[in-house]
């Protein structure tokens, strides 16, 4: 499944080369051919995050203060960790936490 992942608000600094936009190809982990957000977050942790994963994740989810959008819609409205992703979806992660 081809997805576009975008990172902003400083989250891109946790990734290799600090790249904001990533075009990725994920294979479903289960037998029904679906990719859900929980699986995507585990994949991001294993494949994209190169330092301080605790700044992005808390347990199996994103940490408080990280806004997640699936095709410009708040992921909580789409099902949160159980939200099913579809081919060519765009998932955006934005940190709303910053110093002052």
Swiss-Prot record:
Cross-link (Glycyl lysine isopeptide (Gly-Lys) (interchain with K-? in acceptor proteins)): 100
Any one of the GO BP annotations: protein urmylation
PANTHER family: RURM1 PROTEIN
Protein's UniProt name: Ubiquitin-related modifier 1 homolog
Alphabetic keyword roster: Cytoplasm, Isopeptide bond, tRNA processing, Ubl conjugation pathway
Pfam families: Urm1
1-thioglycine: modified positions: 100
Description of post-translational modifications: C-terminal thiocarboxylation occurs in 2 steps, it is first acyl-adenylated (-COAMP) via the hesA/moeB/thiF part of the MOCS3 homolog, then thiocarboxylated (-COSH) via the rhodanese domain of the MOCS3 homolog.
Cystine pairs: none
Source organism superkingdom: Eukaryota
Purpose: Acts as a sulfur carrier required for 2-thiolation of mcm(5)S(2)U at tRNA wobble positions of cytosolic tRNA(Lys), tRNA(Glu) and tRNA(Gln). Serves as sulfur donor in tRNA 2-thiolation reaction by being thiocarboxylated (-COSH) at its C-terminus by MOCS3. The sulfur is then transferred to tRNA to form 2-thiolation of mcm(5)S(2)U. Also acts as a ubiquitin-like protein (UBL) that is covalently conjugated via an isopeptide bond to lysine residues of target proteins.
Pathway in which the depicted protein is active: tRNA modification; 5-methoxycarbonylmethyl-2-thiouridine-tRNA biosynthesis
Subcellular location(s) per record: Cytoplasm
Annotated source species: Oryza sativa subsp. japonica (Rice)
MF GO annotations: protein tag activity
GO cellular component assignments: cytosol; nucleus
């Amino acid at each position: 499944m081809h997805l576009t992942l975008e990172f902003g608000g400083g989250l891109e600094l946790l990734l290799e080369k600090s790249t904001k936009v990533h075009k990725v190809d994920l294979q479903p982990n289960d037998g029904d051919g679906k990719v859900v957000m929980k699986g995507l977050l585990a994949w991001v942790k294993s494949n994209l995050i190169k330092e301080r994963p605790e700044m992005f994740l808390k347990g199996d989810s994103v940490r408080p203060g990280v806004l997640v959008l699936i095709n410009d819609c708040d992921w909580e409205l789409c099902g949160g960790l159980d939200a099913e992703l579809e081919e060519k979806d765009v998932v955006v992660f934005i940190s709303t936490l910053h110093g002052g």
